[in-house]
Amino acid sequence: MQPTDPNKFTDKAWEVIVKSQDIVRAYQQQQLDVEHLILALIEDPTSLAVRILGRAEIDPIRLQQQLEAFTQRQTKVGKSDQLYLGRSLDVMLDRAEEIRERMKDGYISVEHMLLAFVDDERVGRKVLKGFNVDSAKIEASIKAVRGSQKVTDQNPESRYEALQKFGRDLTEQAKSGKLDPVIGRDDEIRRVIQVLSRRSKNNPVLIGEPGVGKTAIAEALAQRIVNGDVPESLKNRQLISLDIGSLIAGAKYRGEFEDRLKAVLREVTESNGNIVLFIDELHTVVGTGSNQQGAMDAGNLLKPMLARGELRCIGATTLDEFRKFIEKDAALERRFQQVYVDQPSVENTISILRGLKERYEVHHNVKISDSALVAAATLSARYIADRFLPDKAIDLVDEAAAQLKMEITSKPADLEAIDRRLMQLEMEKLSLAGEEKVAAPTKERLQRIELEITNLTEKQQDLNNQWQGEKQVLEAISLLKKEEDALRVQIEQAERAYDLNKAAQLKYGKLEGVQRDREAKEAKLLELQSQGSTLLREQVTEADIAEIVAKWTGIPVNRLLESERQKLLQLESHLHQRVIGQQEAVEAVSAAIRRARAGMKDPNRPIGSFLFMGPTGVGKTELARALAQFLFDADDALVRLDMSEYMEKHSVSRLVGAPPGYVGYEEGGQLSEAVRRHPYSVVLLDEVEKAHPDVFNILLQVLDDGRITDSQGRTVDFRNTVIVMTSNIGSEHILDVSGDDTQYETMRNRVMDALRSHFRPEFLNRVDDTILFHALSRSEMSHIIRIQLKRVESLLRDQKISFEISPAACDFLVEKGYDPVYGARPLKRAIQREIENPLATKILENTFISGDTIYIDQDENGLSFTNKAPVKVSVTQITT
């Protein structure tokens, strides 16, 4: 039979014939024969031919080597474009055609060629003689791969062993110990088993947020099936996870995807209930395939089988995707029984982490302390709001362990410091030795360098040996742990197979020996650690977890682990370094923060919400900045919104984002996006009385529930923010009684009346505290001038110019800048006018240059600037 018509062959078979011609040319031969065709057939290790040979217990690599040796012995003619068909290949292809007819297939396929090769007298029988196979054995393995399917089109290979190709056997992975242990979730697993045991519509769908453990429930079921801890209807069943992605991948032509899916479903049906399918991301099934013209929706292929109970299927999807894709298709939805999977509590998460601890220790070759597991659960629940337990806690432990492993395998910091110092000394030595005339001091320096190099080299050698020794002990412990883990899996497999003799040998022989070796190595490591001279640490601690949380969220790690009591006791003194006066305001803010941190308020509300009332320039915004710097170690943790920008009704939507269909919908809101990206910040709503009344409807949610929902349906968490609103309402009443304490209550009542007349009661009722800021006195202004002058001092320091000022000059500036109506802002303008402007002119005129000391004093014309101070008083020494 001449292989000239590709329509008689399947695509893969014709591809093999074309490829065999390249092999002939590579061997510089002219006759295309059986050996070239079979070499092309088994060249791809994932091909159908290799799978068939594997089932027949034929090693394809050994077969390839024998065929290559046979081909090498054939006649070579050099390079030739013209090829001839060998007689034995012609006979083999005729035999393949006969086999096709006998098997009632439509096209000559790879398996027909392979079966014909077994009976080939020239090559086949000779090569296969050593493998102890015959055509019956090959035919049996073909039947095992093909099942009951016929070759009805030119791409039948995609339908063979469809489940093996497009699925992952979870029960097989459970047998070999590749699945992580699943702790808890008993109610959900029992509900899944209950639904699977029904006569019809026996298809549970696991619905829950991402990361709560839906896939883990399917893996737990696989482990229970393997252990026999299931009802009779599920015993000895296979749980196979279907990969929709690989099912779609490469399906180029119309109907090709449906063919693959039908092949999978046929295998499941033919198993007579022995196979349970698990479809992760179930929503991907709906609409899959229907994008091709005339193609069917994969969901529609599943519906009849799901309803009749022929297909037992477990689905898993998130709440949003279930609503978006599956609820729309009511016919598909009613065939699934919903099993809701909630986020576990912190206590349950700790139990889950304890169950997984050993797996992560073996993988990373580190130890994980129990306090680290508790910290991972509690800190992730408190600080990582946009993800779910237990996934976020597991990720924390995994990353902390990976970081520690990286430290173990990297060179220790002490050793790196010695390496760098040695390099510096070597360079200095070369530089000094290169001088033509070496002076006596230089010789002494060279001798000192050589002595230091000798000492450091010895120390480097000792530290290097110690590091390598510790590393070897840790690696040995890791290998023994892995061996111990593998032995435990073998013991479980032996016990399941009732091979109690083998189980006893492994448990009381090998396992005990490995455990003794591991304990000896751990004792050696403990001895090294007890001497206090270890370079490497091998335990993940609470501090490591906190450091990872800090990297994820931006909270400084030292703040996270600092004693809460000590931190809160320092709050007033820290705020007073930046905010002068306003004792009542500082104390009120500090008290509210203390209440929140001591757990004496609702954890579902913001840390604190304050309404700062008072005239302009008295420190309302500065207190918010100081609070941000103290709580979050950065001024940029302040999210500042000028509420005068939200005076019109249409601008209110900018806070949480434009509604769908409007310009800017994709961009999100200015308030919601700022807090979503920086969930740990002080939110300052400046001049809040200028905002449109509708703004306060949004703020009600924030102040009461600690969260808002933006225009895209995302929940933004405000529980870890401090909300500060400033207002000038009633400031005229505060100015009227400045410095008079007797009228304070009257003034406060007037301000509160003004406040109540402007803001609605439900808004004021949700604010933690309304704080009145007093007008600044002269003595307070004297303190503020010192803070303001430090800014000038830092500007001059950049130009290497010193700056000193007399107390009289300070008093002059206070006099010029004091205005109780405008607060501290005129003081800044006075400094700019009286100091910065003249200094700028004098620096440009070169009156003062780098290295000078400027002394500022008062004279009859105002302020004088001289280069040499008669009495030097620095800014920090100014007294009021």
Swiss-Prot record:
Residues 9-74 are annotated as: Repeat 1. Residues 394-530 form a coiled coil. One of its GO terms (biological process) is protein refolding. Residues 564-775 are annotated as: NBD2. ATP 2 binds at G614, P615, T616, G617, V618, G619, K620, T621. Belongs to the ClpA/ClpB family. This is Chaperone protein ClpB 1. It comes from Nostoc sp. (strain PCC 7120 / SAG 25.82 / UTEX 2576).
